[in-house]
Regions:
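Structural motif
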Residues: 41-46, 81-85, 103-105, 147-151, ...
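Solvent-exposed, polar/charged alpha-helical surfaces in well-ordered, non-transmembrane soluble domains
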Residues: 54, 58, 62, 115, ...
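Short active-site loop/helix that positions an aromatic residue
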Residues: 108-121
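Glycine-rich, aromatic-flanked loop segments that form ligand/cofactor-binding clefts
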Residues: 128, 135-147, 152-177, 182, ...
Length: 700
């Protein structure tokens, strides 16, 4: 059955899935099972604990077909919730034959505890708990996400869904007072409603303060901007700063001292980096001015700064920046960006967010180590929600082995550098998936499950016992396939970002108006970024640390062919999982197959566009018309194959409306965009016909 655009939201918000219970699962030795003789109880005075009790009651009713009353009095056969100073951190789950006690260190931790109990029962597919006393302390202070259903969209269902998925902090894009990139947004309403569930809120800052810290009256100017902000939003937990969104008139001679859009001299590009993309010698003072302004009006609001934009810089330069960095500003560091990679001896570094990198990059490790030495608190930009720019409009990269390895490296980072805060996803949002499960289960202090057993239980829970082995094999093939992924700028801002809807532009310019060949990709007019982060005229975006594209592409195509082979093997297992899935879990198995199918077709598109570019360039460099026609034949053959790939994608996006959508771009690969792509290729083929005629004009 087809979905309409945005129908996925209803599934996303279904944090208590109905009818999870397996009637054959009973309590074994060392376990208890809740029955209708039990009650759920809590003492008055803790509002989030009360919400947790009622939420757990709803869970049992909806997911376990068990209806239990709420009581205010503790007693036998009662699951009792309480908050006590006797617990320093987290909560204690004490399970006895006739009583369950949950003692939380603070009110909001009661909700975390009942969600953990739900997780345990979901894995068993029954209201069963092991007997014993279990202490659970969160390893991380915050796990932040953006909304999974729309930019800065946080209805009650979204807040509850993200909390059940293991996240506890939300991010809002701040352009001005009650303004984000979409227009008006009542920030205080979001902050207050989130706080009701114990969820913190932070601002992702886009407010411009084009002020040099040494200019006259600088601090007063910062105070005016950020003071007004903090007065209006006294309950905001933190403000996150980032270089590319916070350029300033640096006086560092190594930079242009201007915004990147103005870095020209008499029309000649100034090739020095712009402030915001370079650790300017005066940047620490600039950050300090913002910190002073924020803390003058609210010392409890945290300030963080991301060095995302200059992780490419040499360590000595970054160390100099850290030497002067304000100690009371948190430093945010990206896990994988700028990771060094070689492919058949060529340099192919990671250029942007990707799940293909499960090892921390040199920038991440060196920045964490040097900051920790200097007493600077570090936070990680980590993408543990399982989405990145790998395939820009999907809910999850279904590669649990890669995600788990990343999670385990972050446990080590917590121990080495006290990295206690995670920015789990950028504006591409999150999905309640195996990635969310792994994030929760790897996030406990001094406790880890058997991860292989956990993944099998997750597969059984979501797809059924007979389907689970095939799901595990699909996950393994796809995890291995991600080892052959290409994380270049032209791919992640091109075919990876919008999938098979990516246009194939014939590169010769046949025009009487000398028009640019770049196409403005069609996106919703209200989209946060929309077409601005989609580059449609495919060509290499070169980098000083990267082998040039004409050398890379043959090697990258070979790598992607390996990825395609592994992805098809995983897809075959996903098809078998659909056949074997339990009836009530079959739709979930179909969605896994659809996700794998969409990604497979995105890989094909990326291979095709690299072949397309090479053929276009070779055609234009030909020395004879006959040679050029051979490449033109190849171009038309690639176009025909891509048309079939696009047509094959349409049923997939019709089945799952989350495929082809991303919060900051809105829909970019739904049925409409895929049919647009078919029209665009028709247009390109009219150009190839014209060019073929032009090649033979001299023969007439």
């Amino acid at each position: 059955m087809s979905e309409r655009n945005y129908d996925f939201r209803q599934r996303h918000w279904e944090y208590h899935k109905p009818d999870r219970r397996n009637p054959e699962r009973t309590a074994s030795a060392g376990e208890i099972m809740l029955t209708d003789e039990w009650k759920i109880g809590y003492a008055p005075g803790n509002p989030i604990t009360a919400i947790a009790a009622n939420d757990f009651q709803e869970y049992l009713e909806k997911s376990m077909n068990l209806s239990l009353p709420i009581t205010r009095q503790d007693g036998e056969k009662t699951l009792w919730l309480e908050v006590s100073d006797s617990v320093a951190e987290g909560f204690i789950l004490d399970v006895k034959e006739n009583h369950i006690n949950i003692t939380a260190a603070e009110d909001k931790m009661s909700f975390r505890a009942t969600i953990h109990v739900e997780d345990l029962m979901n894995l068993e597919e029954a209201p069963v708990l092991a007997l014993g006393r279990f202490e659970r302390r969160p390893m991380y202070t915050t796990r932040t996400v953006h909304s999974g259903t729309g930019l800065d969209a946080y209805p009650e269902q979204e807040l509850l869904a993200l909390l059940h998925a293991g996240y506890d902090t939300i991010d809002l894009f701040l352009v001005g007072i009650d303004r984000n990139r979409l227009g008006y947004c009542d920030f205080n309403d979001v902050i207050e409603r989130a706080a009701k569930y114990g969820i913190n809120t932070i601002f992702h800052n886009y407010i411009q303060t084009y002020i040099h810290p040494d200019e006259e009256g600088a601090q007063e100017k910062f105070d005016a901007v950020y003071g007004d902000l903090i007065r209006r939003y006294p309950k905001i937990s933190a403000i996150g700063l980032c270089g590319e969104a916070l350029e300033f008139p640096s006086r560092d001679k190594a930079t242009t001292g201007k915004p990147h859009t103005q870095s020209v001299i008499d029309g000649i590009p100034d090739t020095r980096p712009s402030p915001g993309w370079y650790p300017c010698e005066d940047y620490p003072a600039y950050i300090q001015c913002i910190e002073r302004a924020v803390h003058k009006f609210n010392p409890q609001t945290s300030v963080s700064y991301s060095t995302y934009n200059w992780g490419y810089c040499p360590l000595e330069l970054r160390k100099k920046f850290l030497d002067n960095y304000p100690k009371n500003v948190t430093l945010s560091i990206c896990f994988e960006i700028f990771s060094k990679r070689t492919l058949e001896g060529l340099h192919t570094p990671v250029m942007d967010y990707t799940m293909s990198a499960d090892e921390p990059g040199y920038y991440f490790q060196s920045e964490c180590e040097e900051a920790h030495k200097r007493g600077i608190t570090v936070t990680g930009n980590v993408n543990t929600a399982g989405i990145a720019w790998d395939f820009g409009c999907i809910p999850l990269v279904p590669a649990p082995a890669k995600i788990l390895k990343r999670d385990l490296h972050l446990r080590e980072a917590r121990k080495k550098w006290n990295l206690r805060d995670h920015y789990c996803t950028h504006h591409y949002g999150w999905w309640n998936s195996v990635a969310a499960d792994l994030g929760k289960w790897t996030g406990w202090e001094d406790f880890e499950p058997d991860y292989d057993e956990l993944l099998t239980k997750i597969a059984i829970r979501d797809y059924g016992k007979e389907a689970a082995p095939h799901v595990r094999k699909a996950w393994d093939y796809w995890s291995e396939g991600m080892n052959h992924y290409i994380a270049s700028n032209e791919d992640q801002y091109g075919p990876w970002r919008v999938g098979p809807a990516y246009p194939f532009i014939f590169q010769p310019s046949i025009s009487r108006t000398m028009a640019d060949k770049e196409i403005k990709f069609p996106t919703a007019p209200h989209a946060h970024f929309g077409h601005c982060i989609i580059k449609t005229f495919y060509r290499p975006y070169e980098n000083s640390e990267q082998t040039p594209g004409f050398l890379r592409y043959p090697v990258e195509i070979r790598s992607l062919q390996k990825m395609l082979d592994l992805w098809n093997k995983g897809l075959a297992e996903a098809v078998l999982a659909v056949e074997k899935a339990e009836p009530k879990k079959k739709d979930e198995a179909k969605r896994l197959e659809a996700l794998g199918h969409f990604i497979r077709n995105a890989v094909i598109t990326t291979i095709h566009i690299k072949e397309w570019w090479r053929a276009n360039i070779a055609m234009q460099a030909s020395s004879t018309a006959e040679e050029a026609e051979k490449y033109l034949d190849e171009i038309e053959k690639i176009a025909a194959e891509e048309v079939e790939n696009v047509k094959d994608t349409i049923p997939v996006v019709e089945f799952d409306s989350r495929l082809g959508w991303e919060p900051s771009m809105e829909y970019v690969c739904d049925k409409w965009h895929l049919e647009w792509k078919l029209r665009q290729i028709e247009s390109a083929l009219r150009e190839t016909t014209a060019y073929r005629r032009m090649l033979n004009l001299h023969k007439q």
